[in-house]
């Protein structure tokens, strides 16, 4: 069945363009990192952009086994998962395309026949903008020199996330067997949050409303928790995804590992499964992420820089907490004792 073009196609394109212009008029803040910032492994999108001038590709191969108990079918699915990300105009703004091209072989056990399908299962283009940066203040990125606990133990304030907004569209081109009768273009909106629970644990959440205005709109959520080991090149993650739609609903679990080969190159492996049997799903995927780093730090004119306050050298004028004050006093006492011990032999020698 040929894909239908919705009447609201011009409005959808105008909406995306207007949103991009709105974001481009907002103030920028550095999002660039020295190490590649990849959404792989897993499906969750982090709140942060790749950085202005950075071109990043994230690709992987996957295989999935689906068995449907009611339809009495078995399916083998294989394909390519690809995402292209570009830091556009601002440090906070990112242009994001993602697509999944897959082949599916369906065996109808009752009829003893087979069917083969192949096309884009996902084809999206959108923009993501970091609306609120929890660590915009550089003081929050600095370690507490007076308290080991403050640096390594979970604090409730760490749950306050950075927040990003995503707006884009799905594209169904030609006679796509996975979406018969689906409009050519349908909007997609998402809110992404990212919290640094501890220096090694990061929590990411996504809430998305997809295929808006179609016969099968879809709500979904993602919760992903990642952990970096003592060797920071290695990290693991666990992820929960929920999907609610008249076409398909399920709850999925994923878990895997990532390895940083170089600052611009990462490899990953993950597997997962669903909870339902209509269909049951078991899958495995492996991929890489690579970036072309053309980022350049912007020079801020001196007249645009913040003035230096009289207390800027003392925690930027911030009053120390009780715990920080106690830790500071203990550190000062230890330093005084150490100085007295060092000066005592010199006095005896005189």
Model-derived regions: residue spans:
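N-terminal secretory signal peptides that target proteins for export/translocation
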Residues: 1-12
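Glutamine-centric residue-chemistry signal
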Residues: 14, 29-31
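Transmembrane beta-barrel domains of Gram-negative outer membranes and organellar outer membranes
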Residues: 31-212, 216-258, 262-270, 275-350
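Short stretches within intrinsically disordered, low-complexity N-terminal or propeptide regions
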Residues: 4-5, 20, 29
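Sec-dependent signal peptide hydrophobic core
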Residues: 13-20
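Functionally engaged cysteine thiol sites
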Residues: 7, 17, 52
């Amino acid at each position: 069945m040929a894909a239908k073009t919705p009447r609201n196609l011009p409005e959808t394109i105008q909406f995306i363009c207007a949103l991009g212009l709105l974001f481009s008029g907002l103030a920028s803040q550095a999002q660039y990192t020295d190490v590649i910032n990849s959404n792989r492994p897993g499906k969750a999108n982090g709140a942060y952009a790749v950085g202005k001038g950075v071109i990043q590709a994230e690709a992987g191969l996957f295989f999935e086994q689906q068995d449907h108990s009611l339809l009495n079918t078995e399916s083998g699915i294989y394909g390519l998962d690809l995402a292209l990300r570009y830091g556009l105009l601002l440090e906070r703004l990112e242009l994001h395309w993602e697509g999944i091209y897959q082949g599916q072989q369906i065996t109808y056990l009752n009829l003893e026949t087979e069917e083969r399908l192949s096309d884009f299962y996902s084809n999206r283009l959108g923009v993501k903008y970091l609306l609120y940066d929890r660590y915009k203040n550089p003081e929050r990125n600095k370690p507490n020199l007076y308290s080991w606990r403050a640096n390594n133990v979970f604090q409730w304030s760490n749950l306050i996330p950075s927040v990003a907004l995503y707006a884009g569209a799905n594209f169904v081109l030609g006679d796509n067997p996975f979406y018969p009768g689906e409009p050519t273009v349908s909007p997609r909106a998402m809110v992404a949050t990212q919290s640094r629970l501890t220096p090694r644990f990061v929590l990411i959440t996504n809430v998305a409303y997809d295929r808006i205005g179609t016969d099968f709109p879809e709500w979904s959520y993602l919760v992903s928790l990642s952990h970096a080991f003592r060797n920071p090149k290695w990290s693991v993650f666990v992820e929960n995804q929920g999907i609610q739609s008249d076409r398909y609903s399920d709850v999925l679990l994923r878990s895997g590992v990532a390895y940083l080969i170089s600052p611009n190159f990462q490899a990953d492996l993950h597997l997962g499964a669903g909870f339902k049997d209509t269909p049951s799903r078991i899958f495995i995927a492996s991929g890489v992420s690579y970036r072309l780093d053309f980022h350049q730090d912007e020079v801020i004119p001196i007249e645009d820089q913040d003035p230096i306050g009289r207390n800027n050298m003392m925690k930027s004028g911030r009053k120390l907490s009780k715990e920080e004050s106690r830790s500071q006093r203990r550190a000062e006492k230890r330093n005084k004792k150490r100085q007295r011990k060092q000066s005592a032999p010199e006095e005896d020698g005189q």
